[in-house]
Amino acid sequence: MTVKLGFVVAEFNRDITYMMEIEAREHAGFLDAEVADTIYVPGAYDMPLAIKKLLERGEIDAVVTIGCVIEGATQHDEIVVQHAARKIIDLSLEFGKPVALGISGPGMTRMEATERIDYAKRAVESAVKMVQRLE
């Protein structure tokens, strides 16, 4: 069975999320998974609604989130990631389907974000493994 993935990709820090998305797509192909749909959202905080829309479609087996939250002058980055992660978990449980967290941050610099591009690959791996193990 080919695992059908939905991607939700943040446009904020697009120079980094673009590279994350490319790596995620390549790894999905390596794992013989299909990226059936992709929704682009402004930022990580905006992901839950797009995730829900993908999960409502019966053909999507799992959702992979791709985002990058870089530290700023305030604690805004921590709030964004904490609330996004909490809602992502809630949606996974509500729909009974894996939603993999491919959001790097908070508390990282742009250089650290560049070094963590492989978080997207890890999220794809997690999503595919969870679908296979929950069959």
Swiss-Prot record:
GO BP annotations listed: riboflavin biosynthetic process
The protein's Enzyme Commission number: 2.5.1.78
Binding site for (2S)-2-hydroxy-3-oxobutyl phosphate: A73, T74, R116
Signal peptide: none
Key word Transferase present: yes
Gene3D superfamilies: Lumazine/riboflavin synthase
Keywords assigned: Riboflavin biosynthesis, Transferase
Source organism per UniProt: Methanoculleus marisnigri (strain ATCC 35101 / DSM 1498 / JR1)
Pfam family name, one: DMRL_synthase
Active site: H76
Cellular component aspect of the GO annotation: riboflavin synthase complex
Family matches, as InterPro entries: LS (IPR034964), LS/RS (IPR002180), LS/RS_sf (IPR036467)
Pathway involvement of the protein, from the record: Cofactor biosynthesis; riboflavin biosynthesis; riboflavin from 2-hydroxy-3-oxobutyl phosphate and 5-amino-6-(D-ribitylamino)uracil: step 1/2
Chain residues that bind 5-amino-6-(D-ribitylamino)uracil: F12, A44, Y45, D46, C68, V69, I70, L101
First-tier enzyme category under EC: transferase
GO molecular function, one term: 6,7-dimethyl-8-ribityllumazine synthase activity
Protein's name in the database: 6,7-dimethyl-8-ribityllumazine synthase
Catalytically driven reaction(s): (2S)-2-hydroxy-3-oxobutyl phosphate + 5-amino-6-(D-ribitylamino)uracil = 6,7-dimethyl-8-(1-D-ribityl)lumazine + phosphate + 2 H2O + H(+)
Transferase keyword on record: yes
Family: Belongs to the DMRL synthase family.
Function, in words: Catalyzes the formation of 6,7-dimethyl-8-ribityllumazine by condensation of 5-amino-6-(D-ribitylamino)uracil with 3,4-dihydroxy-2-butanone 4-phosphate. This is the penultimate step in the biosynthesis of riboflavin.
